[in-house]
Amino acid sequence: MGSETKHSAKVKIVTRESPPSAKEHMRPTKTQILVPPTQSLPNGKKPNFGKSTKQRREPRERTSKTGHEDDKATMVTVNIDAFLHDKAPKKKSCKYKKKKTRQYQDRAAASIDSKPHVAGHTAFAGASFTTDIPHEAALPKPSFV
């Protein structure tokens, strides 16, 4: 009988660990306070109990947008002038930097190129490339007899 009570206890634990229903998963809603129907105030307006008022677009905004486009165009030209003005001295500094790097690259190329040239001249010092080709001279000439 002791084993049966343990089993029944396990069943209860399993049912408690089972996933809750969909309603329990939902986010708890705010408590809604019942407000009596809005009555007009002495000034004629209805009270606003913490509700956000919707801002309505006015046709004036559409006409003001065209004015803003003109302002944007003038701002763009001013920014371009400032951009070009700022870029002018930077280009000069870039030129000086490029010259320095070119000189460094030329020096590096000269030091690298000087070694292969010496090796190349020593390897083919006695060969003339017009008539003497070593790999063809080593091959036997076919005889058509």
Swiss-Prot record:
Residues 1-74, 89-115 are annotated as: Disordered. This is Enhancer of mRNA-decapping protein 2. Keywords: Cytoplasm, mRNA processing, Nonsense-mediated mRNA decay, Nucleus, RNA-binding. It is found in: Cytoplasm; Nucleus. GO terms for cellular component: cytoplasm; nucleolus; nucleus. GO terms for biological process: deadenylation-dependent decapping of nuclear-transcribed mRNA; mRNA processing; nuclear-transcribed mRNA catabolic process, nonsense-mediated decay; positive regulation of translation in response to stress. Belongs to the EDC family. It comes from the Eukaryota. mRNA-binding protein which stimulates mRNA decapping by DCP1 and DCP2. It comes from Saccharomyces cerevisiae (strain ATCC 204508 / S288c) (Baker's yeast). Residues 89-102 have a biased composition (Basic residues).
